[in-house]
Amino acid sequence: VVVTLSISGALLASCGAGDATSDARRSCVYVKRAIALEARSQRPGLSASRRRGLQGTALSELLKGTSSAAAATSIDGSWNPLMTTINEAERVPLLDLEASLTRLCRIADSQTPYL
């Protein structure tokens, strides 16, 4: 009975971690879109208006990933850096967060997504 409960507990824990990873990956879809839009906004020759428009769209796209990142964090607290970094974009330019977000999403998309 104890062995069965231990195995059941381990299986349930791994299911939760899988769900957290799925949520983190879902969030990273928005992160990647936002980073691509931010990169487009940095191209030479854009008007200031077009640059601001792309940056605004990038921020909006990034913030769409907040709920999935929060869901991942609720299941597995090790995804808190992803959620926190996304939320920082409201105060810190996305360009300054790009390296951290890219690294976190690389981890989420890896075969061994552990922080």
Predicted ranges, named:
Residues 12-14:
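C-terminal motif of bacterial Sec signal peptides marking the signal peptidase cleavage site
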Residues 23-44, 103:
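Post-signal peptide N-terminal segment of mature Sec-exported envelope proteins
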Residues 29, 54-115:
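Extracytosolic low-complexity repeat regions of secreted or lipid-anchored proteins
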